[in-house]
């Protein structure tokens, strides 16, 4: 949409709610659907949006650039009174626009001939002219078997990794209405594509000259997702102007967004600090699904709602997102395994997108396009909702029976509240042990908790009323505080690394040879819990300390688990890691290495390190796993860990000298390019910022700046040019909450599971998974529906999606009295080749057929991999035959279809019984099917076949079969077009 002078309108600051990409503005008068809105942020930035819903006294506004940074108090919303319009002109031909309709090709400003509402209107059925004119695409499988007709809506159903982009570009280059070539134009709109895809389309159109008669509209994957809702409408508005105001025949090609899914077992990090496998989130949410849950053996997905909030990025830092919908999808046969330098390993669908670093900054790239050396964005410091559990909470979660022996003050407080202890027990329906002496009276832990809630305000206070806790035996545990502190968490780290917990037999053990660690363990356990440890020594001189207590066994079962520690404050995480390093780590050569025998435990330790802002590498060796921290990160970690092992503490103290950088110190490639732009814009010399050669190498990409060097450059730049926007962006790149994790291996693998899983999160559409990798999900229509809290339809899409799609597709057609026409070919990438996915499924109901791309044909090297059997053009009969293509076209197409179908059936039979069991007739049909695919379906990417060439090729293939088998073609047509008779006729004429 072109920039225009800001229109006058009513301004409001009465925002009551911000949800995903939407905001609710109260007290609005006279707002109308589709009205353009300007949103001014607290920093003065102006964003654009439109009214999605107008109520009596409120309006729901969809913000195109997203709602990040908006608040409900100081954000201003201006209702312009205008609908979303774009300037149109025949000068748009040959131009490249972004998803908002703004030129991005560096060409001259477009002088508008008119301004049109992008929502337009479907063609009035009474004014429609029935489509009947052939459009030649130059592709035999379409022209010969599934003919495109002027004014038709004919979608292409594809899948991830199939060459739909190449096919779309070829159709755009070659398509024409025979005899009216000068009046034919293409409007090509791509939504949610990668930069590589955008570069491909630009190159294809520019180098072949096709751009001269085309308008190219590109919405990139890292553009605001809300643009994807308006991009196809902008494309159709341009097409309507060219068709119905300038008498052109316009082919509109629309590419669609994809879906992204994970393998089960992928670990998702939640805002509460839990690490939950994605399939667990989906299955748990499905229990509350609106239509009864996930049905086994079906690709139909039920949408559930969950209270899970995930960590999300990317706007330079972490946020939290609501999980609003879930999916469980039958898995494809293939997936992509991605391994990174840090040790992260993910198995995802081929179209799943990761946040990758480039010279232009972060952008989303599909897994199938990743390559070794790419750098993925990962979180440097995990920030979660912190919580330290009380000892009572830890014990209440266990199945064991524990007994609380209260203080006298407890029963006095209960009696004061209820009149007597007996009355309190009756009201709470608890047993009253009247015969027991007060000093021997006890309560089961759950009983005590129920009584305590009546006389205390917090769980912490309950500990004050506890004398001691037992597990039914004599071993008493006295808690010195309600919750574990740094000392206890240090012991938990010792136990996790070099100890054990046995909840069955009820003991905790720690073994080591270092006296300082043994003493620390004994002293802390005695001081914090009032228990003693027994000591033994084995034949190797290793001292083993054992605490016999079922109570402490249950406490340390939880506290020694890194997943529990992940939610705790930074100082407790550091204390735990100090115990772990003292017990089973070593410091040497500027590295800190923590060793474990368990792969999952190693991943948990990496997450704990990221709670401290420390990235690490996971390495496997001889059945063990090392978590390694190097460079500046190791030195900073050494300073923060309260180590007690004498030698390790000494090594940590000396680690601050001779610090070296690691790969995780690198800043984004964007830093160098932006630095050069800033220097040129403000006339800053390289020598003003440091070594000229260093600055030059960073700007050219020869050298990568470390975080520290980048920050030094930024600080010097601030002294020279001040606090300007570009320098603020450089600072964000220098000290942002990210690390770059290099991809070391990408491989296509056979998928081993039955299902893939997906969650829809709003508003940021990203998840933090595994050890901090940032990855994507969500589709725009589903996002809006979730943000509006609408009753979800299939797979999280709104129930009105059929209507929404129809408002796009029904803008195609021919109008009586108008020469021009609009033909649509939307391209839909079916998630996991699932034709029942809501978008292709509903598209099939609205449109007039479909072209289906085959993964099997693609694997066999056939381009374009069009499977003609499930493909269909419902208007084909109206656009072919005598006077349109050729008289033999209808019968020839039917015969080719029937023969190919029989050949395909025989191919399946051969797989069972072998070719030897076939008759001679069967072998001819089998040969026909092979030749049909290799000669008719397959053609060059630049091969433009005329309809005559396509039909003649069809007759050549039918010559493989006996004439008696050509039952769908008349004898007259056989005598006229069959190669045998045509050859005789040509010989006679000669």
UniProtKB/Swiss-Prot annotation:
Pfam families xref list: ATP-synt_ab, ATP-synt_ab_N, ATP-synt_VA_C, Intein_splicing, LAGLIDADG_3
Keyword Electron transport: no
Any Gene Ontology biological process: proton motive force-driven plasma membrane ATP synthesis
Role according to the record: Component of the A-type ATP synthase that produces ATP from ADP in the presence of a proton gradient across the membrane. The B chain is a regulatory subunit.
Cellular compartment(s): Cell membrane
Keywords tagged on the record: ATP synthesis, Autocatalytic cleavage, Cell membrane, DNA-binding, Endonuclease, Hydrogen ion transport, Hydrolase, Intron homing, Ion transport, Membrane, Nuclease, Protein splicing, Transport
GO cellular component: plasma membrane
Annotated PANTHER family: V-TYPE PROTON ATPASE SUBUNIT B
Domain of life: Archaea
PROSITE patterns membership: ATPASE_ALPHA_BETA, INTEIN_C_TER, INTEIN_ENDONUCLEASE, INTEIN_N_TER
Predominant localisation class: membrane
This protein's name: A-type ATP synthase subunit B
Alphabetical list of InterPro entries matching this protein: ATP-synt_VA_C, ATPase_a/bsu_AS, ATPase_F1/V1/A1_a/bsu_N, ATPase_F1/V1/A1_a/bsu_nucl-bd, Cro/C1-type_HTH, Hint_dom_C, Hint_dom_N, Hint_dom_sf
Name of the gene encoding the protein in the UniProt record: atpB
Record note on modification: This protein undergoes a protein self splicing that involves a post-translational excision of the VDE intervening region (intein) followed by peptide ligation.
């Amino acid at each position: 949409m072109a920039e225009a002078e800001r229109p006058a309108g009513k301004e409001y600051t009465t925002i009551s709610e911000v949800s995903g990409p939407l905001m609710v503005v109260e007290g609005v008068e006279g707002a109308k659907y589709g009205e353009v809105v300007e949103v001014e942020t607290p920093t003065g930035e102006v964003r654009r949006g439109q009214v999605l819903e107008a109520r009596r006294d409120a309006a729901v506004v969809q913000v195109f650039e997203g709602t990040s940074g908006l608040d409900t108090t100081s954000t201003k919303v201006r209702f312009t009174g205008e609908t979303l319009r774009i300037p149109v002109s025949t000068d748009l031909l040959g131009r490249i626009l972004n998803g908002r309709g703004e030129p991005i090709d560096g060409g001259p400003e477009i002088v508008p001939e008119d301004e049109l509402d992008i929502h337009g209107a479907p063609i009035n059925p009474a004014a429609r002219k029935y489509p009947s004119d052939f459009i030649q695409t130059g592709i035999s499988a379409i022209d010969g078997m599934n003919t495109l007709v002027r004014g038709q809506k004919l979608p292409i159903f594809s899948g991830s990794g199939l060459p739909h982009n190449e096919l779309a570009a070829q159709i755009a280059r070659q398509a024409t209405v025979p005899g009216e070539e000068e009046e034919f134009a293409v409007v090509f709109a791509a939504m949610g594509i990668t930069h590589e895809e955008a570069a491909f389309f630009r190159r294809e159109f520019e180098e072949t000259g096709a751009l001269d008669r085309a308008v190219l509209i590109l919405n990139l994957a890292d553009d605001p997702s809300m643009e994807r809702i308006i991009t196809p409408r902008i494309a159709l508005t341009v097409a309507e102007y060219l068709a119905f105001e300038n008498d052109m025949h316009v082919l509109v090609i629309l590419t669609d967004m994809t879906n992204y899914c994970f393998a089960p077992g992928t670990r998702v990090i939640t805002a509460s600090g839990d690490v939950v496998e994605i399939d667990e989130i989906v299955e748990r949410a499905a229990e509350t699904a609106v239509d009864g849950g996930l049905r086994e053996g079906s690709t139909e997905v039920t949408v559930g709602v969950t209270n899970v909030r995930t960590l999300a990025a990317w706007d330079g830092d972490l946020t939290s997102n609501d999980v609003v919908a879930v999916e469980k999808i039958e898995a494809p046969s293939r997936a992509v395994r991605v391994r990174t330098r840090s040790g992260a390993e993910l198995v995802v669908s081929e179209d799943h997108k990761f946040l990758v670093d480039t010279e232009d900054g972060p952008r989303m790239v599909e897994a199938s396009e990743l390559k070794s050396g790419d750098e993925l964005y990962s979180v440097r410091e995990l920030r979660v909702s912190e919580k330290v559990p009380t000892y009572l909470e830890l014990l209440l979660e266990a199945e064991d029976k524990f007994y609380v022996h209260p203080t006298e003050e407890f029963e006095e407080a209960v009696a004061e509240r209820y009149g007597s202890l007996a009355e309190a027990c009756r009201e709470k329906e608890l047993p009253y042990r009247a015969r027991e002496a007060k000093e021997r009276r006890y309560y089961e832990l759950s009983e005590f908790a129920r009584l305590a809630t009546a006389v205390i305000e917090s769980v912490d206070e309950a500990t004050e009323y506890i004398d001691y806790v037992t597990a039914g035996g004599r071993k008493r545990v006295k808690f010195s505080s309600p919750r574990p502190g740094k000392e206890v968490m240090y012991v938990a780290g010792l136990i996790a690394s070099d100890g054990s917990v046995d909840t069955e037999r009820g003991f905790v053990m720690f073994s080591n040879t270092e006296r300082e660690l043994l003493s620390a363990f004994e002293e802390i356990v005695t001081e914090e819990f009032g228990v003693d440890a027994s000591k033994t020594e084995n034949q190797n001189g290793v001292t083993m300390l054992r605490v016999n207590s079922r109570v402490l066994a249950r406490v340390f079962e939880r506290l020694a688990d890194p997943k529990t520690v992940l939610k705790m404050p930074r100082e407790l995480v550091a204390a735990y890691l100090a115990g772990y390093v003292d017990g089973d780590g070593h410091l040497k050569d500027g590295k800190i290495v923590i060793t474990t025998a368990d792969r999952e435990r190693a991943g948990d330790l990496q997450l704990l390190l990221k709670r401290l802002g420390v990235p690490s590498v996971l390495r496997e060796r001889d059945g063990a796993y090392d978590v390694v921290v190097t460079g500046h990160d190791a030195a900073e970690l050494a300073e923060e860990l309260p180590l007690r092992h004498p030698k390790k503490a000494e090594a940590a103290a000396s680690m601050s000298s001779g610090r070296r950088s690691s790969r995780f110190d690198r800043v984004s490639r964007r830093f160098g390019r932006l630095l050069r732009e800033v220097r040129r814009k403000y006339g800053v010399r390289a020598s003003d910022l440091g070594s000229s050669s260093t600055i030059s190498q960073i700007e050219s990409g020869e050298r990568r700046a470390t975080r520290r060097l980048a920050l030094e450059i930024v600080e010097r730049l601030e002294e020279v040019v001040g606090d300007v926007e570009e320098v603020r962006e450089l600072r964000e790149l220098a000290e942002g909450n990210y690390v770059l994790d290099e991809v070391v291996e990408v491989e296509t693998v056979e998928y081993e599971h039955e299902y893939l899983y997906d969650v829809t999160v709003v508003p940021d559409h990203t998840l933090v998974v595994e050890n901090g990798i940032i990855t994507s999900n969500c589709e725009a229509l589903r996002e809006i529906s979730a943000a509006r809290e609408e009753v979800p339809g299939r797979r999280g899409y709104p129930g009105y999606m059929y209507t929404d799609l129809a408002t796009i597709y029904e803008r195609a057609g021919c109008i009586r009295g108008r020469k021009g026409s609009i033909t649509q070919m939307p391209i839909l990438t079916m998630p996991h080749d699932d034709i029942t996915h809501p978008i292709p499924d509903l598209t099939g109901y609205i449109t007039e057929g479909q072209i289906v791309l085959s993964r099997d044909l693609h694997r066999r090297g056939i381009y374009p991999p069009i499977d003609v059997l499930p493909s269909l053009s419902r208007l084909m009969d109206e656009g072919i035959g005598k006077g349109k293509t050729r008289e033999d076209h209808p019968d020839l197409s039917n015969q080719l279809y029937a023969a190919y179908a029989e050949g395909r059936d025989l191919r399946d039979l051969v797989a069972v019984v072998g070719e030897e069991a076939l008759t001679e007739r069967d072998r001819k049909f089998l040969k026909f099917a092979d030749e049909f695919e290799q000669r008719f379906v397959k053609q060059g990417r630049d091969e433009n076949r005329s309809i005559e060439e396509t039909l003649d090729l069809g007759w050549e293939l039918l010559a493989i079969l006996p004439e008696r088998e050509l039952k769908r073609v008349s004898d007259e047509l056989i005598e006229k077009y069959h190669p045998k008779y045509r050859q005789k006729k040509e010989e006679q004429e000669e």
